[in-house]
Design a protein with these regions (language model features):
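Repetitive helical segments and hydrophobic/amphipathic motifs
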Residues: 11-12
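Bacterial N-terminal signal peptides that target proteins for export
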Residues: 1-8
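Cyclophilin-like peptidyl-prolyl cis-trans isomerases
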Residues: 7, 18-235
């Protein structure tokens, strides 16, 4: 037991001491969008260093793909998800030909620059066993609601990923990332696995409200929450 506690202490010390030598902050781009939901508006900026995802998202907005969709999955304390073109509010018929929007996007994963802090905007994807290149869905996206961590639990998350994920090669979290995860929260279990292409700049209260909606065993909301539309307000 003493040996185990000593090993854990060493891991925690190493975790606390680590930091990226190049501690870059997220580069917020020029494009600003507003996601109008039945619970209020969420304003986000799209990153310029993930241009494929940014341009695709703009195109999907302009095509009306997200109009009147439901938030179809909620993971409490982690994410809210939408983007399935066939899942309209009230069971309405799709307004677009969903078969035209089954495309994928090459990964633009920019960890550690972009990480899963609260408010991160990212595209969903199929799991590694069928998608080793981590290509993204062309329409399905999620927003991180997340939770706050203390430094000890963050260290445990990172060590757990090293132990459980074959080929785990992510660098240790930087001092900046630790500060964000302990003060604002996020979902570090997802870091390095998905393309983050933007972040919420206003409306996190709406994100948190949606994340608290009761769900069934498959993480589907028991009460319908709607994306009325997404509009571009600045480019």
């Amino acid at each position: 037991m003493k040996k185990l506690l000593f090993s854990l202490s060493l891991a925690l010390v190493a975790f606390l001491a680590s930091s990226c030598s190049d501690d870059k902050r997220d580069a917020i781009g020029r494009t600003e969008i507003v996601i109008e939901t039945s619970r209020g508006n969420i304003t986000a900026r799209l990153y310029d260093d993930t241009p494929i995802h940014r341009d695709n998202f703009i195109k999907m907005i302009e095509e009306g793909v997200y109009d009147n969709l439901i938030w179809n999955r909620i993971v409490p304390g982690v994410t809210i998800q939408t983007g399935e073109p066939t899942q309209k509010a009230g069971g309405a018929a799709p307004t677009v030909d969903a078969s035209k929007f089954r495309h994928t996007l090459p990964a633009e994963i920019k960890f550690p620059r972009h990480f899963h802090k609260a408010g991160a905007l990212a595209m969903c994807r199929q799991p590694d066993d069928v998608n080793p290149d981590r290509v993204s869905s062309g329409t399905h996206f999620y927003i991180v609601s997340g939770k706050k961590y203390d430094l000890g639990s963050l260290a445990e998350v990172w060590q757990g990923r090293r132990d459980d994920e074959p080929g785990f090669k992510l660098p240790s979290l930087s001092a900046y990332q630790k500060k964000v995860y302990t003060t604002k929260g996020g979902a570090p279990l997802l870091d390095g696995d998905y393309t983050i292409f933007g972040e919420v700049v206003d409306g996190m209260g709406v994100v948190e409200s949606i994340n608290k909606v009761p769900i069934d065993a498959e993480e589907h909301p028991l009460k319908e929450v709607v994306v009325k539309r997404i509009r571009i307000v600045k480019r």
